[in-house]
Amino acid sequence: MFSSVAHLARANPFNAPHLQLVHDVSGPRSPPGPPRRSRHLAAAAVEGYSCEFGSMKYYALCGFGGVLSCGLTHTAVVPLDLVKCRMQVDPQKYKGIFNGFSITLKEDGVRGLAKGWAPTLIGYSMQGLCKFGFYEVFKALYSNILGEENTYLWRTSLYLAASASAEFFADIALAPMEAAKVRIQTQPGYANTLREAVPKMYKEEGLNAFYKGVAPVWMRQIPYTMMKFACFERTVEALYKFVVPKPRSECTKAEQLVVTFVAGYIAGVFCAIVSHPADSVVSVLNKEKGSTASQVLQRLGFRGVWKGLFARIIMIGTLTALQWFIYDSVKVYFRLPRPPPPEMPESLKKKLGLTE
């Protein structure tokens, strides 16, 4: 299965810009078919890539980039996440960000702000592995199904479909640790560490304790990830087209990473807004026993599900920007192929009468 996916990825339309880098315009046009792959290998050699686009090594390193980008960033903002969760589950006590920090410091001390760091690190590292690794796989797979012209015309829909598919599996890996994290952060005296929380949760509710929140996590994370990837991809495309004063190929690696960070932050703001209501439901659901998502949603009401939005915008905006920056930096460090924003295929230009 994986070998067939790798084969499809090597020939997918997103890879076309790299093939054009080594095209000799003075010579005769190469025939279609097998030579395409050899041209790509030549491009990889010219660029000094460590692996071939679409190879198993490529996907593995993309997954590793996801581990670092999600695991490290989510762990770094645990204090803000803790206060946000407490505002969602007990708005009468925690009335705002600064008030929440003040009460937490007074009751739990500085160490209390780090509650839930272990399940956060483990859970989001596993999620990042699946999210970024599978996104690259599904993007290549779906683009091959659509073909070169349709991939360009429907690229936003492709980004949405690939990211939703990847996040579906990523959340199955995340859900158990997310449930433990919320228990540790929002139920005083329940458990102080992951080692205390997991056995206690299993004893009380069995496996259901770890996966009862997976549907709300899907509700929160799938729209979030769809927005995160699609908005990022199109923002990068727009920045290079309308803002950056020179082509991407002429930008240094550092300049490209700055564009990545800016596009990531813009995407993060939209992500926070789209996913916040479901995030509020998840926080309350994992705190309470026996409640369902619909019951929690009905009880919170419209205003209740938007509690803590400002904190989430700050957190998710910064988080998303850093995640894309780290992920792209990993690609640069390991010398992975980094295709530029997609360009309209020549065949489509001819159909639309855009060629001379």
Swiss-Prot record:
Major localisation: mitochondrion
Mitochondrial matrix side: 81-115, 178-212, 279-308
Annotated GO MF terms: phosphate transmembrane transporter activity; phosphate:proton symporter activity; protein-containing complex binding
Modified residues (N6-methyllysine): K106
Any one Gene Ontology cellular component term annotated for this protein: mitochondrial inner membrane
A biological process term (GO) from this entry: phosphate ion transmembrane transport
Keywords of the record: Acetylation, Membrane, Methylation, Mitochondrion, Mitochondrion inner membrane, Phosphoprotein, Repeat, Symport, Transit peptide, Transmembrane, Transmembrane helix, Transport
Residues annotated with N6-acetyllysine modification: K93, K203
Residues with Phosphotyrosine modification: Y190
Topology, Mitochondrial intermembrane side: 45-57, 136-155, 233-255, 328-356
Membrane topology label: Multi-pass membrane protein
Keyword presence, Cell inner membrane: no
Solcar repeats: 57-141, 154-238, 255-333
Pfam short name (any one): Mito_carr
Transmembrane parts of this sequence: 58-80, 116-135, 156-177, 213-232, 256-278, 309-327
Catalysed reactions listed for this entry: phosphate(in) + H(+)(in) = phosphate(out) + H(+)(out)
Residue range of the transit peptide in the UniProt record, numbered on this chain: 1-44
Keyword Methyltransferase listed: no
Localization in the cell: Mitochondrion inner membrane
Entry's family note: Belongs to the mitochondrial carrier (TC 2.A.29) family.
Quaternary organization: Interacts with PPIF; the interaction is impaired by CsA.
Known function: Inorganic ion transporter that transports phosphate or copper ions across the mitochondrial inner membrane into the matrix compartment. Mediates proton-coupled symport of phosphate ions necessary for mitochondrial oxidative phosphorylation of ADP to ATP. Transports copper ions probably in the form of anionic copper(I) complexes to maintain mitochondrial matrix copper pool and to supply copper for cytochrome C oxidase complex assembly. May also play a role in regulation of the mitochondrial permeability transition pore (mPTP).
Protein name, UniProt field: Solute carrier family 25 member 3
Organism of derivation: Rattus norvegicus (Rat)
Source organism phylogeny: Eukaryota, Metazoa, Chordata, Craniata, Vertebrata
Gene transcribed to yield this protein: Slc25a3
